[in-house]
Amino acid sequence: MAKTAPPPRRASALAAPADTELPMRFGIAAAVFFVLALLYFFPSFLPGRQMYGTDYLAGSYFFYDFFADRFGAGTLPKWVPYVYGGMPVYANPGSAYHPVHLLGEALLPTGKVIGFIFVVQFWLAGLGMYLLARELGCRAWVAFVAGIAFQFTGVTMSWVYAGHDGRIMVSTMAPLFFHFLHRGVRTGSVAPFAGAAATLAFALLSFQIQNSYYLLLAGFIWAVFLLFRHGLHRRPGALGKAVALGFGSVAFAFLLASVNFLPFRDYVGESPRGMQGGRGYEYSTSYSMPPAGLLSMAVPEQAGASIIDPDTQQPLFPANAGFKLHTEYVGALVMVLLAVGVAFAWRNVYWRFFAGLAVFALSMALGGNTPLYRLYYAALPGLNRFRAPDLVYFVAAFSLAVMAALTLERLAELRAASAARRIGAADESGLQKVLWIGLGVVAFAVLGSMMAGGGAAAGEPSRAAGWMRFAIFAGGVTAALWAWTAHKLGSLGAAALLAGLTLTDLWIIDRRFFHTTDGPAQAFAADDVVAFLETQPRPSRVWALSVPGLPVWGRGGSKGGDYPMLFGIEQVAGEHPNPLQRWVEYIGAGTQEITDFHNLLGPQDSLGVVQTQEGQALVFNPRPGLLEAANVRYIVSMAPLVHPGLREVHRGSA
């Protein structure tokens, strides 16, 4: 079978090679991406420190420790008795069987594993974007700049704040997956499809099913496009081979990930997320991306985020109306090149494809804020089992980074052609428009700053300052592009300047989402409550009762966290996304959350706060026998409790 040639680079043969092809080869680029990832996360590897992450500290760390302990003992864990009354391990094994996770567990203490995962995954993000850009015909330095832009793009880097390793494992593999699919369809070789299978298997082994669903959906759209783009629809033999290899790679990826999915298949019907028809449209559209999130692609302060500095407790963004621990920021380079690309790269069929994919992903991310989601909800199989449609935004951010690479490559082609003809760049190429388009982006940002005002409350960062920061970096990118296209700056200087501006720009925002905290030995040391519970007879369960406005014992999340797991203490609830549905119904299923404990708390009219000699206390009246039947012997609360069947047995940190 004849092989299809890669997309041609249209630079003139008369262009100076030293200026069009800089020595940014694969090995150098790979080394730079790795060093940048290691430098970024290095503080988490210091002695006595570990990654800070809201979900990580509430739940993930303890499951990391649980698996490491069981694997170290040579056993395969099947049941977790410590959270939500107990559940099978395969209810959500997380990234336990992911190769990067397993390697980290083999090399490092548990408290360092998540940092290791992030270093490897963000290295692969930059490397994958470099390879994809090269596969699409971009010169090496353009691919390198694009790699920086995606490696540090806001949405994936901001997931670090919660410690969402699964989301990051999937989204950072998107460029590699697209690279292998393109190379496979273009060449007809087996090896690229094997690469696609391995890449997809790594994503699936994260057990982040929702993000993997979005990656598969985007990959399917990409593959169909490529079959037509490379003319395989006119060659039945080549078409059949490519389709067979494509489906075979997906099947092989699921086979590699079957350690997770085969046991999980039988659990779906027992899960709160496995209800026939899902949990309804309102549940599925919860945590939709707000329309203001579109502006956050340029100015993350505009939509805000509900994150704080864990050390100072000061807000790091203006308050968000909902619950938001991430940002949509893609950086000034990507936004300026998006505007420039409309004028210069529109004829590129790949640019138009990724523009369409970005629009599709954005319309999905907006969820319930657009009527289009009802169409997706009805037409796309399995979508009704998910919530938080804003998770698909990583596909949009990825698409925008690819579009930036294609636009920059087009500018490089026009610049080389104008130099070869020995005429001014402005004469026929129209490159002078780059300056005016960039200045238009800067002017829009300055206008936004004038209209934005300050933070929503005292002590919050200013929205106006966010607009001005974007204006400054957009101005820097515009100046660099103008100097380069006007032949006042060489390609080496342009590559260094654009890469440096992009790295600095994204680093400033990303760093708000990266923090470290005390290492496990100090952070998770046994407190007085644990010391008391360890002296009590077992088996029994503990209910860490969340009281609004007060912290939860054990550094837990809204349901108490999984801190007691370290000491073999079983809980009524904990931190877990997919407990047994029958247990959830027993303690009280929620509408927006998995559980609201209404059965254990009792009727709404029996709940309240009363004044006692010790201050305010919580009154509740659970249904008779429910606590006893659940073997709940102790309730841990940060506020006094008023109930005739309870007596205080310990008072200390809770």
Question: What are the language-model segments listed below?
Answer:
Residues 211, 241-291:
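Polar, glycine-rich mid-to-C-terminal structural blocks
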Residues 36-129, 148-171, 175, 281-332, ...:
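Membrane-interface coil-to-helix junctions
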Residues 2-4, 9-10, 163-173, 180, ...:
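Contiguous transmembrane helix-bundle modules in multi-pass membrane proteins
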Residues 129-137, 178-181, 185, 342, ...:
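Transmembrane-helix signature of membrane-embedded glycosylation machinery that interfaces
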Residues 129-152, 187-193:
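Transmembrane-helix signature of polytopic, membrane-embedded enzymes
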Residues 301-302, 309-322, 326, 460-465, ...:
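Soluble catalytic regions of membrane-associated enzymes that act on cell-envelope
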Residues 12-90, 265-274, 292, 339, ...:
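Hydrophobic alpha-helical membrane-insertion signals
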Residues 107, 152, 202-210, 254-256, ...:
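Transmembrane helix irregularities
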